[in-house]
Amino acid sequence: MNREVYNTILARRSIRSFTDKKVSHEDIRTLLEAAMAAPSACNLQPWSFIVVDAQDRLAALYDCAEQGKYYAPLAIIICGTNSHIPWKDDGWLFDIGACAENIMLECVELGLASVCIGGFDEARLSEIFSIPEGVRPVCILEIGYPAWERKPNSWYTEDAVHWQIYDTDRERKMRTLEDLHEDIKNGQM
């Protein structure tokens, strides 16, 4: 059995420390091709991308981030719109998530690292990057070469899995921000 995809999935980690080495335009195009290969409802492809690799534009972007200022040499702002979608729910956000995951997985294949940022000032980011009304910046992917390597890891936990019905007698301990900060302090993130 070929386990390449599974191994890539486990190797994908949120890296928060990058070298200064630039990502080539060829690799950026490969990342965007992977992104656009993501599934989307009715193949409506609600995404668009702003590639940011100029230092002054990166500085402006990081000023919009509430957290997650990791100063990678490349950022991709993934934007989306549902203006062309006949139903008006938030399902298109799943399409954007699949798109982002494809980029993060392809980063692993290219020897790059990434972290997905969802906490930012949406209005300010839209203004700075001339994002038109009706288009939303959904997430920012910071991408670069990792400053250090992390081992692949499975976060599988049996208590997150329910069979046939949701078993309310089982209690799952959810991870907290304190857990994240402890992991960072211990060099695990």
What is the predicted function of each stretch?
Residues 1-189:
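Acidic, surface-exposed loops and disordered segments
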